[in-house]
Design a protein with these regions (language model features):
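Aromatic (Trp/Tyr) and acidic
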Residues: 24-111, 145-158, 192-210, 214, ...
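Extracellular carbohydrate-recognition regions
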Residues: 41-51, 654-675
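Extracellular glycan-recognition surfaces and repeat-rich motifs
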Residues: 61-62, 66-68, 666-699
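C-terminal beta-rich recognition modules with glycine/proline-rich loops and embedded aromatic residues
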Residues: 272, 331-339, 344-450, 485, ...
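Secretory/extracellular carbohydrate-interaction modules
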Residues: 695-758
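Short tryptophan-centered beta-strand motifs in secreted/extracellular beta-sheet-rich domains
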Residues: 715-717, 781-790, 794-796
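Short, aromatic/His-centered strand-loop micro-motif at the edge of beta-sheets
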Residues: 763-784
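Short, solvent-exposed beta-strand-to-loop segments that form ligand-recognition rims
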Residues: 797-817
Length: 837
């Protein structure tokens, strides 16, 4: 952290600070907890302005404000929900909703939303059982109580309601006494970090040592998330899907840093960033998240991310920023908030999409083959996909606002993320301060911070300097500060006076990042850009609540473009076009910043086999004979259909001579999986268990080296089948997609069930066996499987056999990629080697 002390003073003017509670509810970590941890300001201390306020107001007037009318059933938010004493079964749905509702209500200071929240809060606080348990009496599950505790935390910080602290104290005593007999399981075992965070918060209020014992017990009963993130162990649990469920993965990102406050070992502090590194390497997407539909789903541009994942990932980073004082945490948080979050919602915040895809060229009903598939999973609707997201999504923007600026133990403030807002709080021995943040960031590079004080006060103000910023600068009352560097937390510790002003300048340059299949995404500052696609909406259902509909979205303009980037300076190739700031910048046609770049259509790239999603982005460079034309890019979050992984126009350069892949260090570069799951362990790549999955794509899962193009060759790999099914090698493959036979090309597999080796081909999503021979395949035995392809003839060898165990002639496919495939089997692969003739 860069620190600078400034001993000079400036003229002041008068300022009146109103509506600030005199009592400071901020409590820092007590011993033996880790010191120097930042703390969230009481909710309501930060007021959104400008475009950020517009997002909250749309929530109020849209999905959040109308949620009880949209979901009036007793098992949802109806008056007979069990969270209001009725006979419904609200489980996690009500607590999810109330968690976001309370945060929105008190961030906006909205009486109507407060009233909606109060009935749930009062019922919960007034109906605690004598033993300390709260919530619906028949609900025997630790998990749903966790999000309700977040709602109570926010409510207490906003109101100082004296009922909350003894209520939570009583509950945690019950929990500590009963966890041995009734240990965490399933979702509670996955999401124990939430429980731990609230217990630590309460410890700092009461000093009750039993709360630290509770944190230890919760840590011991939870999944070993610190090890999972450190060692990329999401798939190491066989049929237990919890550690690879992407919402759990996102939600538990906070687990290591929460526990690090009690046990400040480097392994605990470092696990979050190591986990993110693993996730982004194996499953990363342009908007800053790992894919998950619902399980971790690889890097394909046609895999998606769930709305719950977006808001939980954000909350985890918001928690982490208070413990790990690194600029990259705020960078990552802004990237998700400014791209993924608005992309999940309709422009008016009335609808959401359960999943969104980096390359989502239409939004229509139909099955994709995801691990958890829903016919409405990418459709814009109040009811898109499964029910969890329509309740959990409400915390996204209000939690972002309330976590943007935090209190520091040395009685100062730290700015984690930027946006138009006002902060009113206490610093320097309970002196009132008001900081007005005037900016259109992230659509502009400049941010002004104006300090309001009734009397001078000495305190540190810590500013995050974005890692991506080129030559960032800060002026204090017109004077340039020195030693401002990108990627640092820059501390200004001085005596502040009324009307002091900081001018922050974070220059943004256009940049590209390599994505799946050697494609690129385009960014400027924290904003990722996508192709501007004209959209055509078709209402498919009108709901009883006025103004709420389901609608499909289809493209009304071409989308299959590649970028002509050439070899020149990127900032001369891609032009930045600025216009006036608008009330809601997340509407593509009125975006205040657009990019212009030359591109070409790629006629061979179209919709996939099921006509629901596009084929995955073709491997770059891609040749195109189409004319060059100027195309427009708009912010990722300003559209509900998009193209954000772009092919690059150029002469194709695929590997076609030889390739060796031993999987010594993890998942291979430029290999992509389609359907199911694939993971690395102990020097082998493995197909994952499909337990808990429901999509048609879970069988016949493929792992394809799309950057290869072989015609005649010797191709071999070690193959081990661990459960009943078949597994083997793919070759001369093109257009792989999600689905058992969703590819064009050949496959030779060892079938443990039938005791055969067979070779066949897929065409038009139909599988055709070309030839088969008996071969006793033993479970858990590694076989060396080899294919020799010469023209139309294929010879298959096993374990170095002198003669082919199988031969066949077929001329449909002349060249293509290589890959691995498993059908209904858990299989392991190693020692891939191919040499062209």
């Amino acid at each position: 952290m860069k620190r600078i002390a400034i001993p000079f003073y400036f003229l002041i003017s008068s300022l009146s600070i109103q509506n600030l509670q005199a009592q400071n509810l901020t409590e820092f970590n007590k011993a033996p907890l880790k010191q120097q941890v930042y703390v969230q300001l009481p909710i309501g201390s930060i007021k959104a302005k400008g475009w950020l306020l517009k997002q909250l107001e749309q929530q109020r007037d849209g999905a959040t404000g109308m949620a009880e009318e949209l979901y009036p059933e007793k098992d949802n938010l109806g008056k007979n929900t069990d969270w209001l004493g009725g006979d419904g079964n609200g489980w996690e749905r009500v607590p999810y909703y109330v968690k976001g509702l309370v945060a929105l209500a008190y961030t906006l200071d909205d009486a109507g939303l407060k009233a909606k929240a109060q009935k749930y809060i009062d019922w919960t606080l007034n109906n605690q059982q004598p033993n300390g348990l709260f919530g619906p009496p028949k609900m025997k599950d630790w998990w749903p109580r966790m999000p309700m505790m977040y709602a109570l935390q926010s409510y207490y910080e906003a109101t100082n309601d004296k009922r909350v602290i003894p209520f939570l104290s009583k509950y945690f005593k019950y929990e500590l006494a009963n966890l041995d007999a009734d240990p965490l399981k399933e979702w509670g075992k996955s999401r124990a970090g939430d429980n731990m965070e609230i217990a630590i918060w309460l410890y700092n209020k009461t000093g009750d040592q039993d709360l630290l014992k509770l944190v230890e017990k919760l840590k011991q009963q939870a999944y070993p998330w610190i090890d999972i993130y450190t060692n990329n162990g999401f798939y190491f649990y066989g049929d237990d899907f919890q550690p690879k469920h992407m919402v759990n993965v996102a939600q538990a990102l906070k687990f290591p840093v929460v526990y690090a406050q009690l046990n400040d070992l480097p392994a605990n502090r470092d696990a979050l960033l190591k986990g993110i590194q693993h996730i982004m390497h194996d499953h990363g997407q342009p908007e800053g998240l790992g894919s998950g539909t619902e399980f971790l789903a690889g890097t394909s541009s046609i895999e998606g991310v769930e709305t719950c994942t977006v808001v939980e990932w954000m909350q985890s980073l918001e928690t982490a920023a208070k413990v790990i004082h690194q600029a990259e945490i705020g960078d990552q948080l802004e990237k998700v908030a400014f791209n993924a979050l608005p992309a999940q919602f309709s422009r008016d915040f009335k609808n959401h999409s359960y999943y969104t895809l980096p390359n989502q060229v239409q939004s229509v009903h139909g099955e994709h083959g995801f691990n958890q598939d829903y016919g409405s999973g990418i459709v814009s609707s109040p009811y898109s996909g499964y029910g969890c997201c329509r309740y959990n999504m409400h915390m996204g923007w209000p939690y972002f606002v309330k976590s943007s600026v935090v209190a520091t133990p040395d009685q100062g403030l730290a700015v984690i993320t930027y946006g138009p807002m006002e902060i009113e709080t206490l610093v320097a021995g309970n002196k009132k301060v008001k900081i007005t943040e005037e900016t259109n960031y992230p659509f502009e590079e400049q941010i002004k911070l104006k300090v309001g004080l009734a009397a001078p006060a000495t305190f540190p103000l810590i500013l995050r300097i974005p890692t991506w910023s080129v030559k960032p600068g800060i002026k204090l009352n017109g004077k340039v500060l020195t030693d401002v560097k990108a990627g640092e937390m820059f501390s200004i510790n001085r005596e502040w006076k009324n009307d002091d002003q900081l001018e922050l300048n974070f220059p943004m340059e256009v940049a590209t990042q390599t994505q799946v299949n050697n494609s690129v995404s385009v960014s400027r500052g924290p904003i990722v850009y996508a192709l501007e696609i004209k959209a055509e909406n078709k209402i498919t259902k009108t709901h009883s609540v006025a103004g709420f509909t389901d609608y499909e979205i289809r493209p009304a303009s071409a989308w299959n473009y590649g970028l002509s980037l050439g070899k020149g300076n990127l900032n001369s190739v891609i032009k930045v076009v600025k216009s006036a700031m608008t009330e809601n910048p997340f509407i593509a046609v009125q975006s205040p910043v657009k990019l212009k770049v030359q591109g070409k259509k790629i006629p061979s790239w179209g919709l996939g086999y099921n006509k629901i999603a596009a084929f995955d982005v073709p491997f770059s460079p891609v040749a195109s004979n189409e004319k060059e034309e100027e195309i427009t890019l708009v912010p990722y979050g300003s559209e509900n259909i998009r193209l954000s992984c772009f092919p690059v126009i150029g002469q194709p350069k695929k590997v076609n001579k030889s390739l060796v892949e031993n999987f010594d260090k993890g998942m291979a570069a430029d290999w992509v999986f389609y359907g199911g799951g694939w993971f690395w362990k102990d020097g082998e790549v493995n197909s994952a268990s499909n337990a808990g999955s429901g999509g048609f794509g879970i069988n016949g899962s493929k792992y394809v080296a799309n950057g290869t193009d072989f015609k005649d060759f010797t191709y071999q790999a070690d193959v081990k089948i661990n459960t009943a099914g078949d597994a083997g090698l793919m070759f001369r493959v093109s257009n792989p997609a999600i689905g058992p036979d969703a590819y064009q090309g050949y496959y030779v597999g060892l079938n443990q069930v039938d005791g055969t080796v067979q070779i066949g081909k897929a065409s038009n999503q139909k599988w055709m066996v070309l030839s088969a021979a008996k071969f006793p395949v033993e479970m858990n035995k590694m076989y060396s499987l080899k294919v020799v392809a010469r023209g139309d003839k294929f010879d298959i060898f096993i374990d170095g056999s002198a003669k082919p165990v199988l031969s066949v002639t077929d001329g449909q496919y002349q060249s293509g990629s290589i890959g691995l495939r498993a059908y209904k089997a858990l299989a392991s692969f190693d020692s891939v080697k191919i040499n062209a003739f």
